[in-house]
């Protein structure tokens, strides 16, 4: 079975590496163009490109997978199936109809819930207790195709984005092998999604990162952990836009929203609209991430200061 893999970030790269190491015949790779990344804005290859080069798999990086160059590449490698994971761009009808066995996407949510670009962040932000991975046959509508395989996992109350993503990557790797083995022998039963139950996980915008301490402690906790460790939830402290990481506890006792009540080696207790949260780390502009205790000792922060939420960002 000839496989073309389509994906871009680390999530996709780990799945591709797993397929190749397990002997699957990946005949081609499509990934996004290299882009400037990090603080120095240095142009770096996508993680999927790195894996393709390592294993000498032919690859392309088109601006659009639906244009002539990409279609010619796909036809030249002749895939039986196309596997997509976190590619970041829409596949058109010509691509979807090209492989004889179809195109399948590995999506980190329990479809039809959380269709879209940011399912892991949104399930955490909304305080969901369960999530999972869905492999489905792609159709023109976003994340709306019939389901081939789905697995569910529970979410720890204080689990961060990084932690949950790692577990979903491992689950995706296991499921990709199971799915392709079944596809190889024609043992796939597709189940239509219940579109009436669909919810959406839109792309993250900068304003989504801002912590509103006037909300209850549970909501504040969920906001911070949804973007921990990247790109980091934001709040304003004086004139600084800072990042917050590592909520380790919540408390029902009241306090003023945003008020830094107490700092020790374990973190800072910060007031919310209902209750308090204990946050472990903070990052000031141009500085490394540090504990609140380090920030206090460095005279960057003291008890009695207040975090604010601003709309002018």
Curated annotation (Swiss-Prot):
Keywords, comma-separated and alphabetical: Protein biosynthesis, Transferase
Family designation: Belongs to the Fmt family.
One Pfam family from the record: Formyl_trans_N
Species annotation: Thermotoga petrophila (strain ATCC BAA-488 / DSM 13995 / JCM 10881 / RKU-1)
Any one Gene Ontology cellular component term annotated for this protein: cytosol
Residues holding (6S)-5,6,7,8-tetrahydrofolate: 109-112
Record's function text: Attaches a formyl group to the free amino group of methionyl-tRNA(fMet). The formyl group appears to play a dual role in the initiator identity of N-formylmethionyl-tRNA by promoting its recognition by IF2 and preventing the misappropriation of this tRNA by the elongation apparatus.
EC class name: transferase
Entry's EC annotation: 2.1.2.9
Gene3D superfamilies: 3.40.50.12230
Protein name as catalogued: Methionyl-tRNA formyltransferase
Catalytic activity from the UniProt record: L-methionyl-tRNA(fMet) + (6R)-10-formyltetrahydrofolate = N-formyl-L-methionyl-tRNA(fMet) + (6S)-5,6,7,8-tetrahydrofolate + H(+)
Top-rank lineage group of the source organism: Bacteria
